[in-house]
């Protein structure tokens, strides 16, 4: 039996004692994704994939394993290199996600939802930083005012 509350589907299990137990939604959004944007579909025959040795810290473990994925989208010529994890499978998945995001920006340009979200995020960070700097400046002026009053009180 499935119930529908607001925007989620809940599965109901009937227990032997006759009590109904409502479980988690049967379909969950991807973990860690705060946005749902329709990204372009990438077909495997349009991709050229290579596995190369990664770079960066890690010493011998990094130097002798080829778990860095280089993915090239043949029609557009976009190249993505992913070496985020030690797992080739996870790097392959992540490289495809990055490629889809880059294709979204390349095809839609300024109309891209990802680009709009990135600009919005940067604007929020700048506003927050500006407010922090304003508060620091106010505190500095307040301390100067207190110090000058204390000096005036001492001199009189």
Curated annotation (Swiss-Prot):
Protein location: Mitochondrion
GO biological process: rescue of stalled ribosome
Family: Belongs to the prokaryotic/mitochondrial release factor family.
Residue window of motif GGQ: 58-60
UniProt name for this protein: Mitochondrial translation release factor in rescue
Organism taxonomic ancestry: Eukaryota, Metazoa, Chordata, Craniata, Vertebrata
Biased composition range(s): Basic and acidic residues: 114-125, 132-156
Region (GGQ domain) location: 44-108
Chain spans, region Disordered: 114-156
Keywords for this protein: Coiled coil, Methylation, Mitochondrion, Protein biosynthesis, Transit peptide
This protein's record includes keyword Phosphoprotein: no
Gene Ontology molecular function, alphabetical: ribosomal large subunit binding; translation release factor activity; tRNA binding
One family name in Pfam for this protein: RF-1
Keyword Protein biosynthesis found: yes
Function: Part of a mitoribosome-associated quality control pathway that prevents aberrant translation by responding to interruptions during elongation. As heterodimer with MTRES1, ejects the unfinished nascent chain and peptidyl transfer RNA (tRNA), respectively, from stalled ribosomes. Recruitment of mitoribosome biogenesis factors to these quality control intermediates suggests additional roles for MTRES1 and MTRF during mitoribosome rescue.
Coiled coil: 100-141
GO cellular component: mitochondrion
Subunit organization: Interacts (via C-terminus) with MTRES1 (via S4 domain). Associates with mitoribosomal S39 large subunit, peptidyl tRNA and nascent chain.
PANTHER family tied to this protein: MITOCHONDRIAL TRANSLATION RELEASE FACTOR IN RESCUE, PROBABLE PEPTIDE CHAIN RELEASE FACTOR C12ORF65
Domain statement: The GGQ domain interactS with the peptidyltransferase center (PTC) of the large ribosomal subunit to trigger nascent chain hydrolysis.
Main location: mitochondrion
InterPro entries: Mito_Transl_Release_Factor, Pep_chain_release_fac_I, Pep_chain_release_fac_I_sf
